[in-house]
A protein has these predicted regions:
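Active-site residues of response regulator receiver
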Residues: 57
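Hydrophobic/aromatic residues positioned on beta-strands within the core alpha/beta folds
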Residues: 84-86
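C-terminal output helix
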Residues: 108-124, 128
């Protein structure tokens, strides 16, 4: 089944970006992936109303996932944003920048795809209801 939702994946690790893109396309989503967060942001500025969900890594060169999310929020406040990290999630929740970015979900790496699929369905179903 093809989903009406489009997902933007941003991870500086080529293998992970490719893995996420392949998995999500197999779930029926239209997926665009970037390994450079600056290019992803430039692309998003041009296509801000196309994507329902952004999945981004936390630690990347040139711009971190939180700063990317804050920039995206200024462009489109309704898009859902998932932030992935291999580091301790607890430390993020009290971070002021994290709060300003209004992250919808935190994903602990390695990400289990069955959990990811459930989180995506829950988040995008909310969009369908609104």
């Amino acid at each position: 089944m093809i989903s009406p939702h489009s997902i933007l994946v941003v991870d500086d690790e080529v293998e992970l970006a490719t893995l996420f893109k392949t998995f999500l396309e197999n779930q029926g989503y239209d997926v665009v992936s970037f390994t450079d967060p600056v290019l992803a942001l430039e692309y998003f500025k041009e296509t801000f109303d196309k994507h329902s969900l952004i999945i981004t890594d936390l630690r990347m060169p040139s711009i971190c996932g939180i700063d990317l999310a804050k920039e995206i929020r200024q462009i489109n406040s309704k898009v859902k944003i998932f932030l992935m990290t291999a580091f301790e999630i607890r430390d993020l929740k009290d971070n002021e920048d994290f709060k300003q970015a209004r992250i919808d979900r935190l994903l602990q790496k390695p990400v289990r795809f069955d959990n990811l699929e459930q989180m995506i369905n829950e988040s995008l179903n909310v969009l369908n209801i609104q």
